[in-house]
Swiss-Prot record:
Catalytic reaction(s) noted: tRNA(n+1) + phosphate = tRNA(n) + a ribonucleoside 5'-diphosphate
Protein name (database record): Ribonuclease PH
A Gene Ontology biological process term: tRNA processing
Entry's EC annotation: 2.7.7.56
Binding-site residues for phosphate, renumbered to this chain: 84, 122-124
Annotated gene: rph
Subunit structure and binding partners: Homohexameric ring arranged as a trimer of dimers.
Amino acid sequence: MRADGRLFDQLRNIKITPNVSEYAEGSAIVEFGRTKVLCTATYESKAPSWLLGTGAGWITAEYGMLPRSTHTRIRRDKSMTGGRTQEISRLIGRSLRAAVDLKQLGEKQIIIDCDVLNADGGTRTASVTGGFVALALALKKLHAVSEIKTLPLINYVSAISVGLHEGQILLDLNYDEDSAIGTDMNFVMTDKGQFVEVQGTAEHVPFTRDQLFKMMDVAEKGCRELFIHQASVMGEIYKIAGA
């Protein structure tokens, strides 16, 4: 039993609230326990210049933390070029591109903004999970008004953290767990069981191949539960593989 009462393979309380922005094409607030992220999707009718003439579109993302999303105030990253900020922004963009057939999207762009309102660990995984909902809702709206000819969603995408502490695998780390953990990993998966991204670091004690595979299994369990949460707020957009 963990300090917050969860089982080792149990997610925090997950809540996704869709359509929270009056102006964005798609939006959602996602909560992983005390971590809360606002995700919005903005449609641009033109692809980036380097894609013009290819027939393909683009999904990109920007991530940021509000100054009082943490215990003490953090300075705004006005340039959006800070190492961690840029790394997570790119992770979110890569992850969400795996959800879409970019050729079907056409020469258009959707920008996903993920703003952390409250941080208690797992902000990047919450951003991917909520960002997918905002993206899917935007695509649904754009298809309904014939801005895009077909709905280009091809996968659900969600993300979760897994840690290894004194030989015990833990799912969905909060801040205290993440700070004390021996091995910290982030997994991004599709509903077809494919891995989009695997990030892992042994902070103190190296992990074995067997432990890695077990962490992958626990991560897949968590991601599959997240797919159900995503589907529950999106309506009939795209059916989860195997559901």
